[in-house]
């Protein structure tokens, strides 16, 4: 019974609400205002960006405390666990927090040395220094774009007084990369040399770099491929430089966009060193370099015995006998000259020997070949037809093609010894197959961003229009119709009241007239009564006159 009564009361309350035309209007208006406010707040809501991620609990609490003191709105990202702030304040907040030493990071740096106590042992001091150095290196490596986190382990050998017992330090680096990111050869080399330069006596070969997947990143570049990224980039730069030179020298002749060139360069990346030693025979003795000279002279004296052919010839004195200097051939390395003089005219004998040694004409040449020398060039050039004033294409003449080919040879540095090849073709370009160039404005990212921002406000206006059209406007229409009906009813009521008032006024006038008539009759009868009392004869004459008029 109570439930039925409550249900009846609820139905009666709903019927009363439905009967009241203001209730739907109020509800629809409130809903429209709420939706509009929500959409405006959504449109004006700031775009949140990541301030810091992968923070420790200490750093996260300190950063949140500082943001609260600065009255900066922030929120936590459930997916990445990062602290997000409005996009326009990210860089400012990072600088302000960095000024306060936040975040400190999971690894401690040189601030660990600020907490050393007095009387600490040398071993503990060395361990703290090594920990601080590892932490600073980890922080530095984490500043590289693809690196999400890093850890560094240093193996520092104990110094020794003996040279043969000294060992080089080594380092192991583990990097945690961002999803979908990787380190290229240049970044790997940069990390290796960064660690090597930060530790005294650490050669780059003793640095090992490993990613979170356990992949060794510091393996030799030639262990799995012939060319590394640096060599490929160098080859691409060489080809691009030659291509730009060809297009730059031919564009003023045939016009911009009327020439396309492709260059293929074969480069030699082998590291070569050559040592050459040459020996040549000595030239003129006057220009030869004297290395050493030895001179021997001997003299003998004694009795001489006569000899010779008997006769007159033997009685003649013998002429002076000079021993000639014998010179070996010029192509010998050691030259020897001997001079001997013997006198048979008496007991005296003299001998002279001279030996000269000259330097060997030797040439030693050590040549280190350049890495990346061009071994061969292959160039292909396509030149468009020239366009006549009437719009018709016309091929270039043989002289023009010969001129273009000669200019291309000079621009590319053509060498027959190297085996270079060049092919120049004159062909009409297909204008419908144009590629490259600047993207249309509707495909540019700036236009897309502006379109998205405008679309957000357009969505707000569209929802507002739909609310006005479907919710607010019908209620206002019904409200206006109800007000009009009420006004019509009021006007009809006023007309009825006016008619009633008019009718009432007529009745009142009739009653007033009747009252006046009654009052006039009473006054007349009173006057007649007074007149009959005062002058009965006049009254009798009046009555006689009335009677006569009635008979007539």
From Swiss-Prot:
Feature: compositional bias, Basic and acidic residues: 272-288
Top-rank taxon, per record: Bacteria
Keyword list, A-Z: Bacterial flagellum, Cell inner membrane, Cell membrane, Membrane, Transmembrane, Transmembrane helix
One Gene Ontology CC term in the entry: bacterial-type flagellum basal body, MS ring
Pfam families reported in the protein's UniProt record: YscJ_FliF, YscJ_FliF_C
Biased composition annotated in UniProt, kind: Low complexity: 328-345
Membrane topology: Multi-pass membrane protein
Cell compartments where the protein resides: Cell inner membrane; Bacterial flagellum basal body
Transmembrane segments: 23-43, 447-467
Chain spans, region Disordered: 272-362
Biased composition (Polar residues): 293-303, 313-325, 346-358
GO molecular function, one term: cytoskeletal motor activity
Biological processes annotated in GO: bacterial-type flagellum-dependent cell motility
PANTHER family linked: FLAGELLAR M-RING PROTEIN
Known role: The M ring may be actively involved in energy transduction.
Family to which the UniProt record says this protein belongs: Belongs to the FliF family.
NCBIfam families membership: fliF (TIGR00206)
Subunit details: The basal body constitutes a major portion of the flagellar organelle and consists of four rings (L,P,S, and M) mounted on a central rod. The M ring is integral to the inner membrane of the cell and may be connected to the flagellar rod via the S ring. The S (supramembrane ring) lies just distal to the M ring. The L and P rings lie in the outer membrane and the periplasmic space, respectively.
Protein's UniProt name: Flagellar M-ring protein
Source organism: Escherichia coli (strain K12)
């Amino acid at each position: 019974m109570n439930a039925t009564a409550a249900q009846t009361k609820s139905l009666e309350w709903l019927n009363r609400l439905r009967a009241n035309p203001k209730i739907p209007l109020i509800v629809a208006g409130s809903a429209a205002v709420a939706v509009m406010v929500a959409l405006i707040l959504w449109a004006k809501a700031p775009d949140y960006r990541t301030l810091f991620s992968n923070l420790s609990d200490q750093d996260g609490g300190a950063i949140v405390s500082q943001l609260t003191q600065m009255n900066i709105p922030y929120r936590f990202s459930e997916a990445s666990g990062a602290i997000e702030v409005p996009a326009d304040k990210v860089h400012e907040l990072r600088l302000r927090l960095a000024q306060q030493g936040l975040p400190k990071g999971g690894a401690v740096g040189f601030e660990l040395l600020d907490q050393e106590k007095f009387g600490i042992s040398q071993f503990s001091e060395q361990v703290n220094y090594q920990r601080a150095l590892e932490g600073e290196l980890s922080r530095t490596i984490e500043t590289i774009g693809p690196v999400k986190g890093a850890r560094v382990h240093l193996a520092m050998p104990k110094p020794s007084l003996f040279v043969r017992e000294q060992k080089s330090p080594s380092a192991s680096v583990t990097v945690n990369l961002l999803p979908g990111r990787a380190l290229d050869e240049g970044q790997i080399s940069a990390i290796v040399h960064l660690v090597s330069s930060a530790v005294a006596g650490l050669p780059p070969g003793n640095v090992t770099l490993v990613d979170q997947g356990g992949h060794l990143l510091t393996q030799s570049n030639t262990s799995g491929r012939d060319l590394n990224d640096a060599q490929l980039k160098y080859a691409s730069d060489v080809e691009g430089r030659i291509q730009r030179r060809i297009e730059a020298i031919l564009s003023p002749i045939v016009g911009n966009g009327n020439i396309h060139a492709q260059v293929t360069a074969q480069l030699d990346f082998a590291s070569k060193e050559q040592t050459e030693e040459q020996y040549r025979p000595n030239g003129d003795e006057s220009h030869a370099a004297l290395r050493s000279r030895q001179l021997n002279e001997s003299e003998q004296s004694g009795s001489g015995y006569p000899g010779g052919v008997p006769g007159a010839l033997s009685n003649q004195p013998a002429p002076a006998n000079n021993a000639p200097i014998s010179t070996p051939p010029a192509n010998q390395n050691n030259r020897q000259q001997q001079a001997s003089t013997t006198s048979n005219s008496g007991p005296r004998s003299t001998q002279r020997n001279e030996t000269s040694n000259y330097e060997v004409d030797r040439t030693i040449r050590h040549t280190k070949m350049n890495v990346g020398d061009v071994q061969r060039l292959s160039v292909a050039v396509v030149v468009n037809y020239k366009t006549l004033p009437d719009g018709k294409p016309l091929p270039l003449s043989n002289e023009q093609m010969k001129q273009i080919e000669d200019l291309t040879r000079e621009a590319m540095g053509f060498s027959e010894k190297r085996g270079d090849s060049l092919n120049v073709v004159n062909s009409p370009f297909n204008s419908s197959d144009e590629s490259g160039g600047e993207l249309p404005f509707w495909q540019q990212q700036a236009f897309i961003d502006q379109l998205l921002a405008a679309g957000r406000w357009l969505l707000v206006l569209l929802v507002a229009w739909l609310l006005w059209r479907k919710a607010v406007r019908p209620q206002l229409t019904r409200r206006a119709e109800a007000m009009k009906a009420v006004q019509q009813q009021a006007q009809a009521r006023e007309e009825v009241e006016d008619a009633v008032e008019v009718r009432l006024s007529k009745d009142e006038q009739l009653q007033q007239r009747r009252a006046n008539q009654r009052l006039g009759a009473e006054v007349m009868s009173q006057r007649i009564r007074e007149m009959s009392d005062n002058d009965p004869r006049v009254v009798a004459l009046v009555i006689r006159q009335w009677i006569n008029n009635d008979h007539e």
